[in-house]
Amino acid sequence: MSMLAERRRKQKWAVDPQNTAWSNDDSKFGQRMLEKMGWSKGKGLGAQEQGATDHIKVQVKNNHLGLGATINNEDNWIAHQDDFNQLLAELNTCHGQETTDSSDKKEKKSFSLEEKSKISKNRVHYMKFTKGKDLSSRSKTDLDCIFGKRQSKKTPEGDASPSTPEENETTTTSAFTIQEYFAKRMAALKNKPQVPVPGSDISETQVERKRGKKRNKEATGKDVESYLQPKAKRHTEGKPERAEAQERVAKKKSAPAEEQLRGPCWDQSSKASAQDAGDHVQPPEGRDFTLKPKKRRGKKKLQKPVEIAEDATLEETLVKKKKKKDSK
């Protein structure tokens, strides 16, 4: 099977992948030759018959590890490094490369990269740059942690004495539950006298300023609303007497205009129809109904002189016709 990250590949499956037909065949040339030399089934190969008795089986390897390595071996890389170092030490002792002098008697000359950079003529000394690369200032435990070396000497467990309790220590046990304890503490905190904080006066003044700002905003909002209302409503809300006087003046102005429009042909029937129309159109209860005076347009004013001029021309034509008849 191909993994998700791998490319596709075709696989051919044989009828007998383990090759059991060959292993079970006793008439093989190699097996007959070994049996003549004294070998029999169940014995291993070799002079002392210490070889493998089973057939070699093919195993699929899908990782990049070495032969015989498993994933669990990766976790023990520090132990592998220790084993490798021990092997190198044994090889050195066998070949005589290790000196007999102990490390305690040796006086190792420490090489400080930081001091060398200070002494050098060139401008190389940068504090963080040199200090980070200088390992002479590091301790042995730090180096072991960096390079992954395990400590060979283990601290004896028996030497560690258990911590003895002090003689002056006192332990108190209470019968209260956790909820009762915290309720008691909260009651004690509430009963404590509250000390006035000097910053509280400042906070109160700030709150008062904010309240004053809110009031000013509300007042300005009301002024804007009253300004946006129509003028007739504003007058009527505050002064009802003045509104009534304005209605009377409007009625007086509309009366002569209605008489002019009626003319001499106005009958009682038209008055009755007007009264009927007035009866039909009644204001709803609880509301004032004011008749707005009708505004006359400029075109209507021009209509009257035109009609008068037409009447004059008709009279002139009639007079001329009468004169002609009389002359004849």
Swiss-Prot record:
Interacts with MCRS1, TERT, TERF1, NCL/nucleolin, and the telomerase RNA. This is PIN2/TERF1-interacting telomerase inhibitor 1. The record marks 50-51 as: (Microbial infection) Cleavage by enterovirus 71 protease 3C. Belongs to the PINX1 family. Its main location: nucleus. Ubiquitous; expressed at low levels. Not detectable in a number of hepatocarcinoma cell lines. Residues 292-303 have a biased composition (Basic residues). InterPro entries: G_patch_dom, PINX1. It is found in: Nucleus; Nucleus, Nucleolus; Chromosome, Telomere; Chromosome, Centromere, Kinetochore. One of its GO terms (molecular function) is telomerase inhibitor activity. It comes from Homo sapiens (Human). Residues 235-261 have a biased composition (Basic and acidic residues). Residues 161-174 have a biased composition (Low complexity). GO terms for cellular component: chromosome, telomeric region; kinetochore; mitochondrion; nuclear chromosome; nucleolus; nucleoplasm; spindle. Cleaved by enterovirus protease 3C to promote apoptosis. A motif (TBM) lies at residues 287-297. One of its GO terms (biological process) is negative regulation of cell population proliferation. The keyword Metal-binding does not apply. The TID (telomerase inhibiting domain) domain is sufficient to bind TERT and inhibit its activity. Keywords: Centromere, Chromosome, Kinetochore, Nucleus, Phosphoprotein, Telomere, Tumor suppressor. The modification Phosphoserine is found at residues 270, 273. Residues 1-28, 147-177, 189-307 are annotated as: Disordered. Pfam families: G-patch. Residues 254-328 are annotated as: Telomerase inhibitory domain (TID). Changing residue 293 to A: Does not affect interaction with TERF1.
